[in-house]
Structure formats: structure tokens, C-alpha cells
Amino acid sequence: TELSGFRLTEDMTETLVIAISQSGTTTDTNRTVDLARSRGAVVISIVNRRGSDLTDRSDGVLYTSDGRDVEMSVASTKAFYAQIAAGFLLAFAIASAVGADLGDRQEFLASLRDLPTAMEVVLSRRSAARVIAENFAPAKRYWAVVGNGRNRIAAQEIRIKLSELCYKSIACDATEDKKHIDLSAEPLILVCAAGLSGSIADDVAKELAI
């Protein structure tokens, strides 16, 4: 793993490990935490499920509390984004504790508080999204999701959820790589392009012109 290859040293007494898990029972995550703690690391976990194995292994816990402790649906994207929000808040807290420049912290926190309203706007467009899905998805056997930067992370999450719900093998690539593959297919491409505008959005469109 990346940890064993680059960060796993014999003495980790000056290391803070942040473990992220929805259920707190993921075997590879918990084994990694055990290994880091055995070498002196301090562990803070971001987790949804209270009383889970991961919470017992952690020196500190930040609960996301994004609903039921036990995940009832594999398509629970809210757990993923709650973890991202918790990670940002923890990063700000750590930066403040060490006296780092927090820059536009207040602006960011205000944007975070506005997320519920933004989500309501997206959910209000479900009917339009359904029409698009019904028109295009059945006509294409091959699907792919693309994105860059922060949108690449969102693309990976979308790929996982679509694969779980639709029982399809779905690719996830960086936008600029798309023109080099799928040469024998005419795929349905879902583009994660939140926040892009102007020439950057135009460049993304050019990259996808297979």
C-alpha cells in the first residue's frame, strides 16, 4: 500500500494518522491503524458508526452522524460527502492549533453551511435527470465517468455507486486520458465538471471529442 511504501517507519511517535470509515469495521483500515499504533502513532478517526471497532482503536473520534449508524444502502453517497466535510473541519482545526494561515476560512465555512440549500436545488432537478437517463443510458452498453482534480474524486464515487446499483463494470478516468482509450466504443460518458467555466470548460469538451 502507499502507507507501507512511503510512510510506514519503525518510529511513528511523531505521526498523526487520520482513518476514515463509514462503518468502522473495514478490515484493511483497522489493520493499518493497529500497525501504526504499534509503532507509536496517534490516530484520529472520522467515522459514522458509534461503538465500532475503529472507534475503539482511536485516540480521538470525529463522528459524521449522517444518519443511521448502520449503512442501509450501498448508494449512500451522503456518508462519503459527510466524511469530506468532516475532513475539512478537522484540517482547519489542526491548522488553527499550529498557527497556520487559514486564508479564506470564513468564506469556506459559509459555503459549507450553504450545502443543504445547494443539495435541495440538485434534488429539485430529479425529473429532468430521469428523462436524460432514460433517453441515453439504455442506448449505450459502455459507460464511463471522467473528471479532473476534485471532480476526479466525485467521478470515482459516482462510478462506484453506478456499478453497485446497475451491475455494470464502469471505467473512471482523467478527462484528458479519455481520447486515448475506448477507440472501438461509443460510450456514454458522464462528466464531472462542477465549478468549471469559460476556457477550462471548453478544454474539457475538446478532450472528450472522441
What are the functions of these language-model segments?
Residues 1-210:
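A SIS-like phosphosugar-recognition module
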